[in-house]
Amino acid sequence: RMPGVMRNGKKQFLVDTNIGKASWNEWYEWIEGINDDLPEPEGLGDVWDNLPDLSPCLIEGILRKGHKMLIAGPSKAGKSFLQIELCVAIAEGNKWLKWDCAQGKVLYVNLELDRASCLHRFKDVYTTMGIEQPQYLQNIDIWNLRGKSIPMDKLAPKLIRRAAKKDYVAIIIDPIYKVITGDENSADQMANFCNQFDKVCTELGCAVIYCHHHSKGSQGGKKSMDRASGSGVFARDPDALLDLIELETTEALLKQEENNATCQACKEYLDAHFNWQDDLTQDD
């Protein structure tokens, strides 16, 4: 407006001054506070007799769909193989480390291996698990990002956009040190980093599973949640935490495992060829 100037036969006036916000930043903070997308508080009494259903289990007794899980372990301990095995278990609806897995589609975000090595590992894991003729290969998608990784706060929106219509039940990110945003020893920066996993879980409704390495030095005197390298936020943030440690393979342990394998082989043979359970009594 131009005060004193005629417009369409009418004189323009300056109505008021010094109203509104003093700067763009001040106005932006004000409008963000009004237009936030946060949910409203709810009264416990309103839902007491009609509680929402718990999310179904993805890994029985360990992880629910829509939750987060951290796998921590020493460097070069086989964490990638373990996560590939988890991909296969979810895709095929099999057991993983003796835990039942719900069947569904899974996205494996490969940040460390070259494409050929990653694909060969998947086939090797299938073969080692005794699955010669996979039935649900279409349930596994692999996103190869070696050499193209970016910080998680920039990766999350791209990941959400690509996965929005895929109906994944789980997204596995291997490893997270490739996409860490900020200093891993800073609690506030790692809290912001872990918030990106929450964003993926919320937007896609799937579980997010990621692995991280142990800190340097001996881990024997530490609690499991203190072994992951960096800030303690890593251990406090996920809904489930699996920690991998290397056990000393003594002669007694090797003998025990050999006996267990022998007994299992004998049981499988008897189950396949005889009705031995009907012929034996409790005294036999």
For the regions a language model picked out, list residue spans one by one.
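Generic preference for hydrophobic
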Residues: 2, 108, 142, 254-256
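The Walker A/P-loop phosphate-binding site
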Residues: 37-127, 132-133, 142, 157, ...
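Phosphate-binding/switch region of NTP-binding enzymes
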Residues: 70-71, 76, 80-81, 150, ...
